[in-house]
Design a protein with these regions (language model features):
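Membrane-interfacial alpha-helical segments at the cytosolic side of multi-pass membrane proteins
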Residues: 82-96, 141-157
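Small-polar-interrupted transmembrane alpha-helices in polytopic inner-membrane proteins
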Residues: 19-24, 104-124
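Interfacial helix-loop-helix junctions of multi-pass membrane proteins
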Residues: 116-138
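Membrane-interfacial, low-structure loops and terminal tails that flank and connect transmembrane helices
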Residues: 2-5, 158-174
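Hydrophobic alpha-helical transmembrane segments
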Residues: 14, 105-110, 136-137
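Membrane-helix interface segments
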Residues: 11, 99-106, 129-133
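"…centered on the first transmembrane helix and the immediately adjacent amphipathic helix/loop
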Residues: 2-82
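Membrane-interface loop-to-helix entry segments
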Residues: 72-88, 133-141
Length: 174
């Protein structure tokens, strides 16, 4: 009975990946002006938080100056983060289905990078936006971090190398 329930629930493990792809697609659907304003707002929020936590005493002019200066890195870091999360959301279901090692890295990487490339193509159809190979590269770095995180997390959760664990178990039976 338990195996039947697990088999029925396994396909639902892809829902977070589909939701993440939808979110990325919706961000890419924003025109260039909306996207820039959103990035500036987020950068401003980061510097307001830094000022509050570290008690820097920055006035609004200084915060705006820093937000303008760091808007581009904040935007690219957001790209990396969303693709890192996408890679996690894609890798975990593949892991659940039994993919491990290089096969997991390769398939999850191909799926996520292909989505990044298609997302850049989608931006050609949005006002004031354009494709960028550099963005696909930045997205790919996020994908690499996400897949590495899943592989390390699952390896640690399973207690390291499964071959050594199986050998250890056999010794106790003799």
């Amino acid at each position: 009975m338990n195996r039947i329930v697990i088999a029925l629930l396994k396909p639902f493990s892809f829902i977070p990946a589909i939701l993440m792809m939808s979110m990325i697609f919706s961000f890419s659907s924003q025109n260039g002006t909306e996207s820039s304003q959103r990035s500036e707002k987020e950068a401003r929020g980061i510097f307001i938080t830094i000022d509050h936590i570290m008690d820097r005493g920055w006035d609004d002019e200084k915060i705006q100056e820093l937000a303008d200066e760091y808007q581009y890195p904040v935007r690219k870091l957001a790209h990396m983060t969303e693709y890192c999360l996408l890679a996690i959301c894609v890798s975990l279901p593949l892991y659940v289905y039994g993919l491990r090692g290089f096969a997991l890295t390769f398939l999850a990487g191909i799926l996520c990078v292909a989505f990044a490339a298609s997302d850049e193509f989608h931006q050609t159809m949005v006002a004031n936006r354009g494709p960028s190979v550099k963005d696909v590269g930045i997205d790919s770095i996020g994908v690499l971090f996400g897949i590495t995180f899943v592989r390390l997390f699952c390896w640690i959760a399973l207690g390291g190398n499964t071959k050594k664990r199986k050998r250890r178990r056999r010794r106790y039976y003799y």
